[in-house]
Swiss-Prot record:
Keywords: Acetylation, ATP-binding, Chaperone, Nucleotide-binding, Stress response. The gene is HSP70-8. GO terms for molecular function: ATP binding; ATP-dependent protein folding chaperone. Gene3D superfamilies: 3.30.30.30, 3.30.420.40, Actin, Chain A, domain 4, Substrate Binding Domain Of DNAk, Chain A, domain 1. The keyword tRNA-binding does not apply. Pfam families: HSP70. Residues 1-25 are annotated as: Disordered. This is Heat shock 70 kDa protein 8. It comes from Arabidopsis thaliana. In cooperation with other chaperones, Hsp70s are key components that facilitate folding of de novo synthesized proteins, assist translocation of precursor proteins into organelles, and are responsible for degradation of damaged protein under stress conditions. SUPFAM superfamilies: Actin-like ATPase domain (SSF53067), Heat shock protein 70kD (HSP70), peptide-binding domain (SSF100920). The modification N-acetylalanine is found at A2.
Length: 563
């Protein structure tokens, strides 16, 4: 990759405010990119509809990997592999979406140690060490750098086909991504010379496409269109997302979201462990054979697996569908749990659902289809979308809408009312996570809670921000922290500490903190405003250091205010 691909553009170059001087009369084009764990796609609004771009091999779906076998790294956009096994020699890094923004204590990182490239951990809460095998030596890199190299190739491919510079992009992301992971995605885009208009949860992008289809159907039927409830189930190689959306007249309101980092990679690893001989390391040949078996089991009751492992070791096994489903029972149970949770959070029953939309590669697995159809009490799956293209089409639509492009036929008169996928709150009441903005709150959102001191004459308070759903802070993602100083001396429980959180339409989170005293109508010290997240690397170290340094001396407890 050219040196420029590794250069992070300056802040001014990534504002997205510059326009191409060569084409001043043309509206800014925004790409829609769906970067999947195993493959990606890229699309753009061409003036009348969404157009999915193809690579030089005429493929809409592009494998998500970067090879380091030469001095110049090459991604799946430009690099053509002679055989699938070339990606499994250690010289290629893939599954980068599963690794971006994760620390080395994360179970997903530990599961990635089975991959052909090097993944090392110290288990102390810092970024894992990853490396590719180049000329019999390990070359270190980061998931963000790998993602940036891949994004550069996508951008260059798009610019070559569109014959104009491209800067703006809408990327789809998993529901379960933390804000720290989102900032890492944005950083990779900046390294690739792209300005992020929006990081869009994948089911939200699909909901936008669904809203457009319902709007067009309503126009064709000359009606106003009644509200339709849909469940969106999206399961790819690395993540599983669920959403309940209410759609009417081109407006899609996300009523609930749920997500988990489970996907086809987990199913693949389970299958490999099942068919591999005892003490046999997972080789590239075994991975390819297991993947092929899973694909064939979508329309066959059993498959024959033949793998020559070398040195006289061979695998010859028949794998039937029931056996495959038993091996992956926990994954399928998690899929069911997510849908049940999402329906419960949306306060709807399966019988209330008008359409069941299933997308992503794993949506073809018969067991997955059966489970989700049963939970949603649907006999049929919505056939209006391509399961492998729905997310990128929705992202391209959002790119056109956000860019202010007008369509005379009204096909871009669309709006998605988003919801917060994870709760945001503070550490208080000991080691408890106290949500300030609950999960599935409509965005934009602004909420506050009151806390108070735990020590007499406590002059400072530590405001520690977390994101997640766990009851204790250790179960959640640390976003950042700051100190509130200048609290007037008073008995514990007297000062009122107001913590306000604000999430705007672009999903930016700001935290405000103020100190009030009895009899005072205004803050006694200046209000503090901090944009989150503030923590970069070293989540584990930060949390541990805060405990060692301050203990419970600057803690807060929830204040029960008299109404």
């Amino acid at each position: 990759m050219a040196e420029a691909a590794y250069t992070v553009a300056s802040d001014s170059e990534n504002t997205g405010e510059e326009k191409s001087s060569s084409s001043p009369s043309l509206p800014e084009i925004a790409l829609g990119i769906d970067i999947g764990t195993s493959q990606c796609s890229i699309a753009v609004w061409n003036g009348s509809q969404v157009h999915i771009l193809r690579n030089t091999r005429n493929q809409k779906l592009i494998k998500s990997f970067v090879t380091f076998k030469d001095e110049v790294p090459a991604g799946g956009v430009s690099n053509q592999l002679a055989h699938e096994q070339e990606m499994l020699t250690g010289a290629a890094i893939f599954n980068m979406k599963r690794l971006v923004g994760r620390v080395d204590t994360d179970p997903v990182v530990h599961a990635s140690k089975n991959l052909p490239f090097l993944v090392q951990t110290l288990d102390i809460g810092v970024r894992p060490f990853i490396a590719a095998l180049v000329n019999n030596a390990w070359r270190s890199t980061t998931p963000e750098e790998v993602l940036a190299i891949f994004l550069v190739e996508l951008r260059l491919m798009a610019e070559a086909q569109l014959k104009r510079p491209v800067r703006n992009v809408v990327l789809t992301v998993p529901v379960s991504f933390s804000r720290f992971q989102l900032t890492r995605f944005e950083r990779a885009c900046a390294m690739a010379g792209l300005h992020v208009l929006r990081l869009m949860p994948e089911p939200t992008a699909i909901a936008l496409l669904y809203a457009q289809q319902q709007q067009m159907t309503t126009h064709d039927n000359m009606g106003s269109g009644s509200e339709r409830l849909a469940v969106i189930f999206n399961m790819g190689a690395g993540y599983c997302d669920v959403a309940v959306t209410a759609t009417a007249g081109g407006v899609s309101q996300i009523k609930a979201l749920a997500g988990s980092p489970i996907g086809g990679e987990d199913i693949l690893q389970n299958t490999i462990r099942h068919i591999a001989p005892p003490n046999e390391e997972a080789s590239g040949l075994l991975r390819v054979a297991a993947q092929d078996a899973i694909h064939r089991l979508t329309d066959q009751e059993n498959v024959q697996i033949e793998v020559d492992l070398g040195n006289g070791n061979k695998i010859s096994k028949v794998l039937d569908r029931l056996e495959f489903e038993e091996v992956n029972q926990k994954v399928f149970e998690e899929c069911e749990r997510l849908v049940v949770q999402c329906l419960r959070d949306a306060r709807v029953n399966g019988g209330d659902i008008d359409d069941l939309i299933m997308v992503g590669g794993c949506s073809y697995i018969p067991k997955v289809r059966t489970i989700i159809k049963n939970v949603c009490k649907k006999d049929e799956i919505y056939k209006g979308v391509n399961p492998l293209e729905a997310a990128v089409r929705g992202a391209a639509l959002e790119g056109a809408v956000t860019s202010g492009i007008h369509d005379p036929f009204g096909s871009l008169d669309l709006l998605t009312i988003q919801a917060t996928p994870l709760a945001v709150g503070v550490r208080a009441n000991g080691n408890k996570f106290i949500p300030v903005i609950p999960r599935n709150t409509m965005v934009p959102a602004r909420k506050d809670l009151f806390f108070t001191t735990v020590q007499d004459n406590q002059k400072e308070a530590l405001i520690i921000i977390y994101e997640g759903e766990g009851e204790t802070v250790e179960e959640n993602h640390l976003l950042g922290y700051f100190k509130l100083v200048g609290i007037p001396p008073a008995p514990k429980g007297v000062p009122e500490i107001n913590v306000c959180m604000d999430i705007d339409a672009s999903n930016a989170l700001r935290v405000f903190a103020a100190v009030l005293m009895p009899g005072s109508s205004s803050p006694v010290v200046p209000v503090i405003e901090v944009r989150m997240p503030t923590v970069d690397d070293g989540h584990g170290w930060c949390a541990q250091a805060l405990n060692v340094k301050y203990g419970a001396t600057l803690d807060l407890i929830t204040l029960q205010r008299k109404m």
